[in-house]
C-alpha cells in the first residue's frame, strides 16, 4: 500500500501527539478514547497504538 501525503502527516502527528493522529484517521470514537488513555499511561504505548490505527485503516 503506497503512502499518501496525508498518511505521512498523520504519522508525524502520531509521533508528536498520538491522539491527534488517531483522530485524523478514525474521528471521535472508541479508538480515540483508547489512545488518549494509553498516552496518559505512557507516551510510547500511545504512539504504538496510533501507528497501528494509521497502518490498519
Swiss-Prot record:
Cellular component GO terms held in the UniProt record: plasma membrane
Membrane topology note: Single-pass membrane protein
Residues passing through the membrane, by range: 34-54
Subcellular location: Cell membrane
Record flagged with keyword Cell inner membrane: no
Keyword Membrane: yes
Keywords assigned: Cell membrane, Membrane, Transmembrane, Transmembrane helix
InterPro entries tied to this protein: PMP3 (IPR000612)
Main location: membrane
Family note: Belongs to the UPF0057 (PMP3) family.
Protein's job: Plays a role in the regulation of membrane potential. Could mediate a proton leak.
Protein name per its UniProtKB record: Plasma membrane proteolipid 3
Organism whose genome encodes this protein: Aspergillus fumigatus (strain ATCC MYA-4609 / CBS 101355 / FGSC A1100 / Af293) (Neosartorya fumigata)
Gene label: pmp3
Amino acid at each position: 500500500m503506497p503512502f499518501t501525503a496525508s498518511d505521512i502527516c498523520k504519522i508525524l502527528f502520531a509521533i508528536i501527539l498520538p491522539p491527534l493522529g488517531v483522530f485524523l484517521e478514525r474521528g471521535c470514537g472508541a479508538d480515540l478514547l483508547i489512545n488518549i488513555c494509553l498516552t496518559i499511561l505512557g507516551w510510547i504505548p500511545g504512539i504504538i497504538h496510533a501507528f497501528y490505527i494509521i497502518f490498519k485503516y
